[in-house]
Structure formats: structure tokens, C-alpha cells
């Protein structure tokens, strides 16, 4: 992405269907890695204690069933993102800025969990677009060199995708 008019470029990208199966192939690998991280992390008490504020309910061994006990998009996104990052080793994207595309998983999943009338391809498309936005931004500018935290790109990518989903 060029540095000019990023808002328009992101809007146009989100409004355009993905044309290449390469997008989905890469996203599939990242999704599988993310699922593995979430499932393994959920077996550790210290992760669950950190990820879930409300300790009044008993946790299921399947972390995706625990999502149903959370009260908001934010709680679902936080829970899944903490579980993802606890064991997230394999999806580091190296460019001018490093990134972990799987950091977008929690926010995108929270939308589709609350809106189950979509198909899995809609979920993978949204997640792939978040990955692409974050990766494209990382190719252009190193935030760390400017004194900012690289997770801003996650916030921007996840926020853009989530906002576009809300308009559907």
C-alpha cells in the first residue's frame, strides 16, 4: 500500500473480492496455526486466569465453548487473542515491521460468533483481508523505528475489517 490515502486504499481493498487462491492458501496455514495455539494455550491455567476476567464459571476444555460465556465482542476478542499469543511462534511476518497476522483472529472471530448466519468462506475472507492489510502496512513502514508499537497495524487491520463487517 502506498502511504497516501491509506483510508481510501483500505476501503477499496475491503470492497473488492479476493482474486487469488494464494490468499486463501496462506490464510489457511495461519488459521490452522492459530487454532493450534488457542487449543494448546487453553490447557494452561495461568493463561485462562489472565484471559478471563469473570472467574464465576467453570471452563470447558474446548476454548471455543468458553466463548459462549463471555459477554461482548471485546471479551471474546481478548480471550482468543491472549490464547493465540501465548503460543504463537510460527506466523511471524518479517518486513520493515514485524507482525503476527494471527493477532487479528480474535476480533474477526468475535464478529462471526455473534453473527452465525455467515458461511466459513466469509470468515476466511475477512481474516485474509485483515492479514493482507496488516502485511501491506508492515511492508511500507517500521513503526518501531518511529517509536510506536507495531501492534497498531493489528488494531488498524482488525478495526477496518470489523467495521466493514458491521456494515453487512
Predicted segments with their positions:
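N-terminal core-entry segment
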Residues: 1-168
Amino acid at each position: 500500500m502506498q502511504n497516501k490515502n491509506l483510508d481510501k486504499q483500505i476501503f477499496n481493498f475491503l470492497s473488492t473480492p479476493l482474486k487469488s487462491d494464494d490468499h486463501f492458501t496462506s490464510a489457511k496455514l495461519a488459521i490452522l496455526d492459530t487454532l493450534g495455539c488457542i487449543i494448546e494455550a487453553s490447557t494452561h491455567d495461568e493463561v485462562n486466569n489472565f484471559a478471563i476476567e469473570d472467574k464465576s464459571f467453570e471452563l470447558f476444555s474446548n476454548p471455543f465453548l468458553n466463548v459462549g460465556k463471555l459477554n461482548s465482542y471485546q471479551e471474546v476478542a481478548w480471550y482468543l487473542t491472549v490464547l493465540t499469543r501465548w503460543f504463537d511462534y510460527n506466523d511471524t511476518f518479517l518486513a520493515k515491521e514485524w507482525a503476527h497476522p494471527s493477532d487479528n483472529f480474535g476480533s474477526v472471530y468475535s464478529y462471526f460468533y455473534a453473527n452465525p448466519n455467515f458461511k466459513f468462506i466469509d470468515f476466511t475472507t475477512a481474516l485474509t483481508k485483515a492479514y493482507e492489510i496488516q502485511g501491506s502496512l508492515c511492508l511500507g513502514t517500521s513503526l518501531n523505528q518511529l517509536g510506536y508499537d507495531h501492534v497498531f497495524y493489528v488494531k488498524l487491520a482488525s478495526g477496518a475489517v470489523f467495521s466493514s463487517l458491521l456494515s453487512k
